[in-house]
Amino acid sequence: MSKKKSPDLFLDNNSDEAEFKGAPGQKISLSGILPGQIIRTMIENGEIWSQGNISEEQIQPASLDLRLSDIAYRIRASFLPSEGSVQEKLTELALHKIDISDGAVLETGCVYLVPLMEALSLPERIKAISNPKSSTGRVDVFTRLICDGSHEFDKVPGGYKGHLWLEISPRTFPVIVRQGTRLNQMRFRRGNTKSSDKELKKLHTEDNIVFNGKADIAEGLAISVNLKAATEESIVGYKAKRHAGLIDLDKPNKYKVAKFWDPVFMNDESRIILDPGEFYILASHESIAVPPSHAAEMVPFNPSIGEFRVH
C-alpha cells in the first residue's frame, strides 16, 4: 500500500523529503503517489501529452488510463529495448502490422505490441509505473508497458521523454480492441511511496483497512482466498471456458457469464486444486477499505506463495 498526497508542490520542489504545512497541525510530505489533481496539472503543463485530447474520464483518483493507438504489431517474442528504442527493436521482431482503428481481433497465444496515444515528458523527480486495469485482468489479457531505453517492464524512469508502448497477450479469450481501448493504467510517483509494516498497522488501527477480520501484515497486507460458503451448492469462484468466443473489450455488461465461465462450488474440504494453465476468478476472504490518503496495488507474482500471477 502506498501513500498518496496532493500538494501542487510535488512538481516544483527539489527535495523528496521536504514537508509543508497543510491543515493546522498537519505536515504534508512530498513523497507519494500523485493524485488526480496533480495528473491534471501535468497534462496542462505538457508533461503528459497525447495524439488527441485526454478526456476527464481517463483521470482516476490516483492514476491515468492509457489508450491504444490505431496500429498493432504482431511480434515474435516480447522484448525490452535496453539502450535502444522500441521502434528499432520492432524492425527485427515484428511479423506484421494490423490496423485496429475500427476494431480488430487479437488471438490467444500471440504477442502484440501497440503504441499508446499518451506520451510523457516527465520531470526528473517523477517516475511512473503501469499495471493492467482490473477489467483487463478479469478476462486474462496479459499486458506490460515498455518505453525507449527501458530495462524493466511497466516502469518509466524519472525524466523520461518519449512514447509508450503496450505489449498485449490474450491468454484465454480472443479479444476485440480498437483505437482508444483502455487496457492499462499509469501511476506517477515521487520519492518513497511504500508504506512500512509499522505504518500499515497504524493505518489499520486508525482506519480499519480490513473490516471483516484480522489484518495479516508482514511485508505488506496478505490477502487470502475465500473457499467457504453457506451451502455446498454455493459458488466460490469461476473457471474460464476454453474456446468460448470473442470478447469486445469496449462492450462491458454485454456477455452472459455462463457462456464464458464454469462455476466452482464449495466442497467438504474447503479447498480446490487449480489446473495448470487454466484461469480462475476467486474472491478474497478479506474485505478491504483503502483510505483516500493512500493507494493500493497487488503484487502480481510471489514465488514464495505459488507459481501463478494474480490481478
Residues covered by each model-derived region:
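DUTPase catalytic domain/fold
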Residues: S2-H311
